[in-house]
Amino acid sequence: IHEGHINILKTANKYGEVIVGLLTDEAIASYKNIPHLNFNRRKIIIKNIKYVKKVIPQRTLDYVENLNLIKPDYVVHGDDWKTGIQKKTRERVVKTLRKWSGRLIEPKYTKNISSTIIKNKILEIGTAPQNRVSRLKRLMNSKRIVRILESHNSLTGLIIENLKVKKKQAYHEYDGMWSSSLTDSATKGKPDNSSVDFSSRISSLNDMMDVTTKPLIFDADNGGQIEHLSFLVRSLERSGVSAIIMEDKIGLKKNSLFSNQKDAKQDKPEIFSKKIRQVCNSRQSDDFLVIARIESFILGKGLKDALKRAEIYSKAGADAI
């Protein structure tokens, strides 16, 4: 919230009772990253502003659904949408208002301030680990598809942090990072067989976390020894990691992209489930996700085996498969 928003609300209040259509997390996530505050927390702030009579959810970027629901005498919006990405949205609002002789009021846009500018200032300061941990879960609850890209150092992390592509009416970007044991090992000139230990990987990970704010998934291969998992989870949460993903293979790690998997072996479902439960019992927050990666297809065991394992792992506490 900034003075531009207050100016809009103050102007709207001159024309009657003010109803605010507040974009849901899902609506915001459809064209940019999710907001720092979730819908309910934003709603509490808005409805306690003295100019506001009521707050209703706006579930899409299009205003027509709410306009037909309320049939307001006036719609108040800054004049910045006369050009640019929201121009067609404005045209639909004008067309809809004509049905009941409604009017569009457009106060002059407040320059040199925007929610994007404020957000970028916040990002310059950085984000607390506990805030970052919860972001992946919020993304998965808000978006149909969450886009994650591999990152193995600070530079690749910054690419993921800043890359945006304009497509039709929205900007598209990656939602988070994936710390891959394959690329982490490759950048160190070592094979992808767990030669690079977790301590070394977490050191590289912390460098990435220093210069980025997006959530990160940590690929932990098969998770290692069950007795060590609780210490790994604590280190990851302390760094702000959002999720750990473990595969149900055993023995010396062999990359699943290799065509020859004859020596690879799959863990017994009941034993791998113990690892999942160990992570669940070790995490400080339920927002830290446990993802089980099932290798049945890679090892030629097929869908039936994979589905059986998926059900067992879900019951053990896996948040995602």
Regions found by a protein language model. Give the residues of each.
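Nucleotidyltransferase catalytic core that binds NTPs
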Residues: 1-130
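Alpha/beta enzyme core
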Residues: 130-321
